Amino acid sequence: MSLVTQIIVNADDELRYPTIGELQSIQDYLTTGSNRIRIATIIRDKEKEIIQKASKQIFQLHPEYIAPGGNAAGSRKRSLCLRDYGWYLRLITYGVLAGDKDSIETIGIIGVREMYNSLGVPIIGMLDAIQCLKEASLEMLGQDDIRIISPYFDYIIRGMS
């Protein structure tokens, strides 16, 4: 649900008009609309480059993942990791475009920690991978865009912690 929709639903549930603070949140969201679209476009267009940088960084941090017997050993396991990285980048752009974290919660974070645990994927590695994706993504963006996108990466990191 978008920020605007969430504010309207909350106000309607409470049989009231949106508060001054809620209206200000809507105004802030609307004035950053072109930034949000630009961020989503950059992340989409630079996805392969971002994933390449992030994967290089994560495998330098955790070389044991690509060593024989590691969770990303071999081309098949490694490609599954990289697929997940693309999935997280898409989740981030959904949140950025919606202006809230509900889409991330609904689509992706619920149960992800349990799934990784059941598959034997080290959570610390996923947390580090999301941080690496964040750093690689931020290299592509300006300061205004960084302020918009960073909380969505941080939300996923906190949700998986």
Swiss-Prot record:
Topological relation to the membrane, as annotated: Peripheral membrane protein
Entry coiled-coil feature ranges: none
Pfam families, per the entry: Phycobilisome
GO biological process: photosynthesis
Subcellular location: Plastid, Chloroplast thylakoid membrane
Domain of life the protein comes from: Eukaryota
TM spans (from-to): none
Any single GO CC term annotated in Swiss-Prot or TrEMBL for this entry: phycobilisome
Post-translational modification: Contains one covalently linked bilin chromophore.
Amino acids binding (2R,3E)-phycocyanobilin: C81
This protein's UniProt keywords: Antenna complex, Bile pigment, Chloroplast, Chromophore, Electron transport, Membrane, Methylation, Photosynthesis, Phycobilisome, Plastid, Thylakoid, Transport
SUPFAM superfamilies in alphabetical order: Globin-like (SSF46458)
Chief subcellular location: plastid
Family to which the UniProt record says this protein belongs: Belongs to the phycobiliprotein family.
Function description: Allophycocyanin is a photosynthetic bile pigment-protein complex with maximum absorption at approximately 650 nanometers.
Name of the protein in its database record: Allophycocyanin alpha-B chain
Organism annotation: Pyropia yezoensis (Susabi-nori)
Lineage, uppermost ranks: Eukaryota, Rhodophyta, Bangiophyceae, Bangiales, Bangiaceae
Gene behind this protein: apcD
